[in-house]
């Protein structure tokens, strides 16, 4: 069974037992969270597509860890003006273990 969930402004296709990295969620490590923003649920032979959400469908996840992605380098430059600017960014993430998919 699989589901399409929405969290952090993005959509993810998940199945039970998978591990995914999503935008940071304010939750403690080891805590169970119920995600109710489920856009679609399928089991191979049939699929339920929400308008926009599937009513009564939930996905239970467990928070495994928090961390930061690799650094992305940003370099801005204006030609002939002696202007150069360097910057970096590390996006924070939460790693989730997908549990039960209901609905």
UniProtKB/Swiss-Prot annotation:
GO CC annotations, alphabetized: cytoplasm; ribonucleoprotein complex; ribosome
Keywords from the named record: Ribonucleoprotein, Ribosomal protein, RNA-binding, rRNA-binding
InterPro entries (alphabetical): bL21-like, bL21-like_sf, Ribosomal_bL21, Ribosomal_bL21_CS
Any single biological process term in GO: translation
Molecular function GO labels: rRNA binding; structural constituent of ribosome
Pfam families: Ribosomal_L21p
Domain of life assignment: Bacteria
Role according to the record: This protein binds to 23S rRNA in the presence of protein L20.
Oligomeric form and interacting partners: Part of the 50S ribosomal subunit. Contacts protein L20.
Cross-referenced PANTHER family: 50S RIBOSOMAL PROTEIN L21, LARGE RIBOSOMAL SUBUNIT PROTEIN BL21M
Family: Belongs to the bacterial ribosomal protein bL21 family.
NCBIfam families: L21 (TIGR00061)
Protein name (record): Large ribosomal subunit protein bL21
Annotated organism of origin: Variovorax paradoxus (strain S110)
């Amino acid at each position: 069974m699989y589901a399409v969930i929405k969290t952090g402004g993005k959509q993810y296709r998940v199945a039970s037992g998978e591990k995914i990295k999503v935008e940071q969620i304010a939750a403690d490590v080891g805590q169970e969270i119920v995600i109710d923003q489920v856009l679609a649920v399928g089991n191979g032979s049939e699929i339920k597509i929400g308008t926009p959400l599937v009513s009564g469908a939930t996905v239970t996840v467990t928070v495994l860890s928090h961390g930061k992605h690799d650094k992305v380098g940003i370099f801005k430059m204006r030609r002939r003006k002696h202007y150069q600017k360097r910057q970096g960014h590390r996006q924070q993430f939460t790693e989730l273990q997908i549990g039960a998919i209901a609905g």
